[in-house]
């Protein structure tokens, strides 16, 4: 089987773009694409986005960086190559080894180093940054890192271009949306627009008025999940939509039920983090209570089940 590449078309390069096109000469094309190119195209070049990606990430001068899919764009008599963000791709537009992409949930730079070439996404939130790393002397060796920005800047240096970084807003209930945008902009500057993903929690019954109840000893809300206004129910959904309109990709997280996930998709997130294991554990616990009651007919078992 004959392999056709952009390099085999012998197209002239757009003047001044030789260093860019050197990276894509090995890009494979179909025989139909090759025929169309030979008969209709005079030059080969790259898009402005392609240039921005290469400028952002210093990589081998003969390669395109991981985390991007190569696409052909026709512009008059010029065939341009674009780099589209897609973490299922390794360097040079090659697919990763499997369809399963791995994500790490960590804010420990020392922990991230050995896995940096195996993951395609990293998630972290303020709690992980401070509780599990900065304020943990066993993890934050020599108290080297003092605040969240220092940690995230170091993580950005460690991870390559092929890894998205999902970082959670410090206060998703901030009433001033411009303040939220300022925080998102700061992370975009740290990670680049190509890697940053803003993590938004599914709030549901949790609001700015009762969120502090989750920090108390029993970590329970004083009202049940049905006691919530329609506006509060869809607060985080609308926050996702607003951030998306502002140009950010969203990691919508903290769903515990399948039906929540289906509705969350209407907010057009880039990622969904759904904790179905929690529902599995609860279902198995309920099933166990029922089995014990069937065997013992002990009424206290039913009382414990209701409390659960």
Residue ranges and their predicted role:
Residues 94-96, 191, 241:
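Solvent-exposed alpha-helices and their adjacent loops that cap or buttress functional pockets
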Residues 1-99:
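Long, compositionally biased, glycine/small-hydrophobic-enriched stretches that function as flexible linkers
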Residues 90-93, 107, 221, 242-243:
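A generic structural signal for ordered alpha-helices
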Residues 24-68, 209-231, 290-308:
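Charged, glycine/proline-rich intrinsically disordered loops and linkers
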Residues 56-64, 188-214, 269-297:
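Repeat-unit-sized solenoid/scaffold elements
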Residues 215-241, 246-308:
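Catalytic alpha/beta core domains of metabolic enzymes, predominantly
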Residues 68-83, 98, 103-234:
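Active-site beta->alpha loop and helix N-cap motifs at the rims of alpha/beta catalytic domains
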């Amino acid at each position: 089987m004959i392999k056709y590449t952009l390099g085999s078309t012998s197209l002239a390069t757009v003047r001044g773009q030789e260093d860019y096109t050197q990276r894509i000469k090995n890009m494979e094309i179909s025989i139909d694409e090759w025929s169309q190119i030979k008969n209709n195209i005079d030059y080969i070049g790259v898009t402005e986005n392609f240039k921005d990606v290469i400028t952002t990430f210093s990589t081998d001068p003969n390669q395109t960086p991981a985390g991007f899919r190569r696409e052909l764009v026709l512009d008059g008599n010029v065939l341009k190559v674009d780099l589209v963000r897609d973490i299922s791709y390794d360097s040079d537009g090659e697919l990763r080894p499997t369809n399963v992409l791995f994500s790490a949930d960590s804010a420990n730079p020392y922990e991230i180093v050995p896995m940096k070439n195996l993951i395609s996404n990293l998630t972290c939130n303020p709690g992980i940054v401070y509780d599990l790393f900065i304020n943990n002397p066993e993890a934050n060796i020599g108290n080297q890192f003092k605040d969240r920005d220092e940690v995230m800047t170091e993580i950005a240096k460690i991870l390559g271009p092929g890894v998205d970084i999902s970082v959670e807003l410090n206060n998703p209930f901030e009433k001033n949306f411009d303040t939220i945008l300022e925080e998102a902009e700061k992370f975009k500057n740290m990670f680049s627009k190509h890697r940053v993903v803003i993590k938004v929690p599914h709030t549901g019954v949790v609001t700015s008025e009762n969120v502090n109840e989750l920090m108390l000893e029993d970590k329970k809300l004083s009202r049940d999940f049905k006691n919530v206004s329609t506006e509060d129910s869809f607060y985080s959904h609308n926050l996702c939509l607003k951030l998306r309109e502002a140009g950010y990709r969203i990691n919508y997280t903290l769903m515990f039920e399948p039906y929540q996930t289906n509705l969350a998709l209407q907010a057009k997130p880039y990622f969904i983090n759904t904790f179905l294991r929690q529902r599995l554990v609860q279902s198995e616990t309920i099933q166990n209570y029922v089995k014990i009651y069937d065997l013992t007919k002990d009424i206290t078992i039913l009382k414990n089940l209701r409390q659960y």
